[in-house]
Swiss-Prot record:
Protein name: Large ribosomal subunit protein uL23m
UniProt key word Mitochondrion: yes
Pfam families xrefs: Ribosomal_L23
Chain's gene name: mRpL23
GO cellular component, one term: mitochondrial large ribosomal subunit
SUPFAM superfamilies in the record: Ribosomal proteins S24e, L23 and L15e
Subunit relationships: Component of the mitochondrial ribosome large subunit (39S) which comprises a 16S rRNA and about 50 distinct proteins.
GO biological process, one term: mitochondrial translation
UniProtKB keywords: Mitochondrion, Ribonucleoprotein, Ribosomal protein
Family: Belongs to the universal ribosomal protein uL23 family.
Length: 150
């Protein structure tokens, strides 16, 4: 249930008002391998399973079969200098199961960047291999410069 109040009725037409709850949902990549019809959301702590289901069905028109929620404990960390312990906020995760016919795949926005990075890694590996061949050639004469070869 939202904590915001629905606007008061006012006489006359049109009734221009929109009720926006203070709920939020964030689509996240799952940490473990999941079936293609299961989608993981990070939701606000106040949301229940029924709120998640209604949110997706009414606003986004998604057919929802099942909703499971859990509260993931925030990460604790010890400060290296002073030794005090800090803890990140807990997060509520919702696992939404869609019908078997539907599947969700994260879009690959950075495929061009991955190709470019692979190309750069290939050229770096080639230069490393060339340098290694140079070192192997001069193994028997340590300390001599490269121009001093036969």
């Amino acid at each position: 249930m939202s904590t915001r109040w629905y606007p008061i009725y006012q006489r006359g037409n049109p009734q221009l008002r929109v009720f926006l709850p203070n709920f939020w949902m964030k689509l996240i990549r799952p940490t473990e391998e999941q079936p293609p019809n299961v989608v993981t959301f990070s939701v606000s702590m106040e949301m229940t399973k029924y709120d998640v289901r209604n949110y997706l069905e009414k606003i986004y028109k998604l057919p929802v079969v099942d909703v499971r929620t859990r509260i993931a404990m925030g990460e604790t960390k010890k400060d290296q200098t002073y030794g005090y312990i800090t803890k990140k906020d807990d997060v509520k995760l919702a696992y939404v199961t869609l019908p078997r016919e539907e599947s969700f795949v994260f879009p690959d926005f950075f495929s061009e960047k991955a190709e470019k990075q692979a190309k750069e890694e290939k050229s770096l590996d080639e230069s490393k291999a060339g340098f290694r061949r140079f070192l192997d050639r001069n193994k028997k004469r340590p300390g001599t410069p490269g121009w001093f070869s036969i």
